């Protein structure tokens, strides 16, 4: 049986992880764009990252028997710097049109700010223009942010957006947000980690 890993960030992993995944039956992975630990300061650093994901990482994975695909986006964690985000979106088309790009994502909210919403909506439009699937990041619960509020706002935006629900994954749901997402026709994603988000218990 072939297993597909639909959401993994391999740029921060070693080739030992590819070997372990292959041994477990994983033959295909999809890597969404993500925040690398510090905010980028220039559009060019985003573009270098997109190229690395689309070309180098695909080649690296293939050496270990794994087919690697990418989702391209300005991640919500970096969407609050609106001038930088918009300049990056203006140059993102070649990466979205790359044959190894299979979706736009992750997009959505980090702190549920107006700037994040602007960037989210622009990227939804970019996906729709290309008939690409969309992978949506829902915010984490923090002292300042409630995940359920972020999911509610995301679902409101998606209703206004009127894109084929079968093309949209609302990811990182929890027991608090799953009832909201399951009332819609969007795919409801769960994230399993050993010690955070959902875990085996």
Residues of each region from the PLM?
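Mid-domain alpha/beta scaffold segments of enzyme catalytic cores
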Residues: 1-157, 161, 167-168, 172-176, ...
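H/E-rich (His + Asp/Glu) clusters that bind or coordinate divalent metals
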Residues: 184-201
């Amino acid at each position: 049986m072939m297993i597909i890993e639909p959401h993994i960030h391999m740029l921060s992993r070693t080739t030992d992880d590819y070997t372990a995944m292959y041994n477990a039956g994983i033959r295909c992975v999809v890597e969404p764009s993500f925040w690398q630990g510090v905010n980028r300061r220039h559009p060019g650093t985003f573009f270098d990252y997109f190229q690395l994901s689309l070309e180098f990482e695909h080649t690296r994975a293939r050496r270990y028997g794994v087919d690697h695909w990418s989702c391209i986006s300005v991640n919500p964690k970096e969407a609050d710097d609106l001038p930088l985000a918009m300049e990056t979106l203006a140059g993102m088309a070649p990466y979205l049109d790359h044959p190894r790009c299979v979706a736009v994502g992750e997009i959505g909210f980090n702190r549920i700010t107006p700037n994040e919403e602007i960037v989210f909506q622009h990227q939804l439009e970019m996906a729709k223009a290309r008939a690409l699937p969309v992978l949506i990041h829902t915010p984490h619960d923090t002292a300042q942010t409630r995940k359920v509020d972020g999911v509610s706002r995301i679902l409101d935006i998606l209703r206004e957006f009127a894109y084929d629900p079968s093309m949209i994954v609302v990811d990182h749901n929890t027991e608090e947000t799953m009832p909201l997402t399951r009332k819609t026709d969007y795919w409801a994603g769960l994230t399993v980690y050993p010690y955070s988000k959902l875990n085996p218990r």
